[in-house]
Regions:
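Sec-dependent signal peptide recognition
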Residues: 2-11
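N-terminal soluble domains immediately following signal/targeting peptides that reside
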Residues: 22-186
């Protein structure tokens, strides 16, 4: 988390859309984690690997379910197709604000095992394609997946805690990471 809090600028790597589809990391990169009451919450959304990737514009494909949580309030995050950076939120609340984003279901069509073999090997599963063949699974198959992302931002103060936003897959901070961060920017 410290890495995410202190790294405010990511290099945008131009990649093809097929590369974005094969990338499995999805993250929110706020311009500032510490806002004043009158500041707009601006954040880029990235897809890539090892925190290097492409910044994407607002699209319903990537924002099927997106909300801002704070002080027992939940507000639907709205955007316009093509907004870049993707998040430009005017309405925030004093204390901890939690951005939660869930994509729609996406699909990767594997026509043969070569791309799957490269991907699974890069993720540390060198024998997975061989096991796939041994089990006589089809070489032409479809993978379905959703992407989930969450970020905490403070407005005016760092009071508050992370909450369960009811995503299918979610990490919840037991301690407030913004209180524990040694470097705060305003």
């Amino acid at each position: 988390m410290k890495f995410l809090l202190t790294r405010l600028i990511f290099v945008i790597v131009l990649t093809s859309t097929s590369k974005i589809g094969l990338s499995h990391e999805y993250w929110i990169d706020p311009v500032n984690y510490y806002l004043k009451n009158d500041e707009k919450l601006v954040a880029g959304i990235f897809i890539g690997d090892n925190f290097e990737g492409s910044q994407i514009a607002f699209s319903k494909k990537y924002f099927k379910n997106s909300n801002l949580f704070s002080n027992n309030k939940k507000i639907k995050i709205r955007g316009r197709l093509g907004d870049f950076p993707a998040l430009n939120i005017k309405e925030t609340f004093e204390g901890i604000n939690i951005i939660q984003i869930e994509s729609e279901v996406n699909y990767i069509h594997y026509k043969n095992l070569s791309k799957f073999e490269v991907f699974s090997s890069n993720k540390g599963y060198k024998n997975l394609a061989d096991k796939h063949r041994e089990k006589n699974y089809p070489e032409n198959f479809v993978e379905s997946y959703k992407r989930y992302a969450k970020s905490l931002i403070s407005v005016e103060n760092i009071d508050g805690n992370d909450v369960d936003t009811n995503m299918e897959l979610e990490l919840i901070f037991l301690d407030n990471p913004l209180k524990n961060s040694k470097k705060r920017k305003r």
